[in-house]
Amino acid sequence: MRVQVSPPALTHSISRGGPNFGVGKHIIIELENCPFRVLDDLHTIEHTLLEVVKVLKVHLLHSYFHKFAPQGVSGCIIIEESHISVHTWPELGYAAIDVFTCGLVDPSSVVEFLKKELCAKRVSSKLLVRGPGEIK
């Protein structure tokens, strides 16, 4: 399959963020003690992750969400600036969310939003600088 990159996507480069920025930022978010009904609801998870796109002011390209039986939801949103993914384990009250953004977008701004929307009692996150070389 041949993929063409649109001109706006070409603005995402190492030089935009400086030498300590890499090509982007990737935040890993662990949400715990969330209600089963929230994490098992496809509509709630999809709506919440699409709201993250708005909060970050990034550009949606594609999204796909899947409801598992007997429980759980996974989804991925492809944004011009990279991606957002989610996997839920309602039986554990746990959701794993990754937000990877290129350019100057700061993905850490969505942590509290996700905690509130998914009714998490506990949240932890780790921000990684992505790019060539060692993980920082």
Task: Label every PLM stretch briefly.
Residues M1-K136:
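Polybasic/polar functional segments that serve as interface/processing modules
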